[in-house]
């Protein structure tokens, strides 16, 4: 009997050690899957278009893109992510920037791609900048919204942020929510929730559509056109091939916590202010475009 009891105690101890090991391994994998980067462009990004038009400071903390008659320019993240928040301070092209487009977005680069877009559309001198946002889910887009910015984005850096989790996507400017796109997959609305996405940033000639529907083209005599970036933060789950780590409600995956499932009351007040005073186009109000058959999400809660 004594030998049996001793054997049981040993087995219980081994079982406890095994379970602790599994827990520690899971915690370690979850922790390793999440990354906080406070901004070295050389470490986190690679140039995808026109290296001669991309200028990075010696310490890697700031970067600029150039557009001229020769080419635009672009860079992309080394990693792919599934949920998190990206904050990118940007200083836009000053003066006459009509026809230029600065795109900051997440994309899965798949045929049925998911994508979350910021597009900053250049202006004629004296006119306000327009910020366009869009969401692709399972290859479908046509979800554009446009606002006028309430400040001059060429005078200083302003932070453009994307919060993305299982519950919602929140577009923010200087941490003011300007748009949400909620997960209504249970109601038949496509939502980006399975495909990891990388960060892409590009500056290019959008003369055919960007400013007043293409009426105002890029004036190359005003160039070159320069956009600057600095002090970004990536706080997101790096894709390692297993979605459950990125979906876990862990201390490192703070964006999955209950408080981020919808806008706070304070955020809702700011959101309503933006929609009331600065919104200039919302696809959910464009009955003509959709032949009076608006997408399902247009009838569902935004927060």
Feature locations, PLM:
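GH16 jelly-roll
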Residues: 2-3, 12-303
């Amino acid at each position: 009997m004594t030998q049996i009891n001793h054997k049981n105690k040993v087995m219980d101890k081994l079982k406890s050690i095994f379970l602790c090991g599994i827990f520690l391994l899971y915690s370690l994998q979850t922790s390793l899957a999440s990354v906080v980067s406070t901004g070295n462009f050389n470490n986190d990004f690679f140039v995808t278009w026109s290296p001669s038009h991309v200028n990075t400071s010696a310490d890697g903390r700031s970067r600029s893109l150039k557009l001229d008659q020769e080419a635009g320019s672009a860079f992309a993240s080394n990693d792919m992510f599934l949920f998190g928040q990206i904050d990118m301070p940007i200083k836009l092209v000053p003066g006459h920037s009509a026809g230029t487009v600065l795109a900051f977005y997440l994309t899965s680069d798949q045929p049925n791609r998911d994508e979350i877009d910021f597009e900053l559309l250049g202006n004629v001198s004296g006119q306000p900048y327009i910020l366009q946002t869009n969401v692709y889910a399972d290859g479908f887009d046509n979800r554009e919204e446009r606002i006028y910015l309430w400040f001059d984005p060429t005078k200083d850096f302003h932070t453009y942020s994307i919060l993305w989790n299982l519950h919602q996507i929140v577009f923010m400017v200087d941490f003011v929510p300007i748009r949400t796109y909620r997960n209504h997959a249970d109601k038949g609305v496509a939502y980006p929730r399975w495909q990891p996405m990388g960060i892409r940033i590009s500056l290019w000639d959008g003369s055919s559509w960007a400013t007043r529907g293409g009426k105002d083209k890029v004036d190359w005599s005003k160039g070159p056109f320069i956009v600057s970036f600095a002090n970004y933060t990536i706080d997101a789950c790096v894709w390692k091939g297993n979605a459950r780590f990125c979906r876990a409600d862990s201390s490192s995956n703070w964006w999955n916590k209950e408080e981020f499932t919808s806008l706070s009351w304070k955020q809702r007040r700011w959101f309503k202010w933006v929609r009331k005073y600065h919104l200039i186009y919302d696809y959910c109000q464009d009955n003509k475009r959709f032949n009076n058959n608006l997408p399902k999400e247009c009838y569902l809660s935004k927060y």
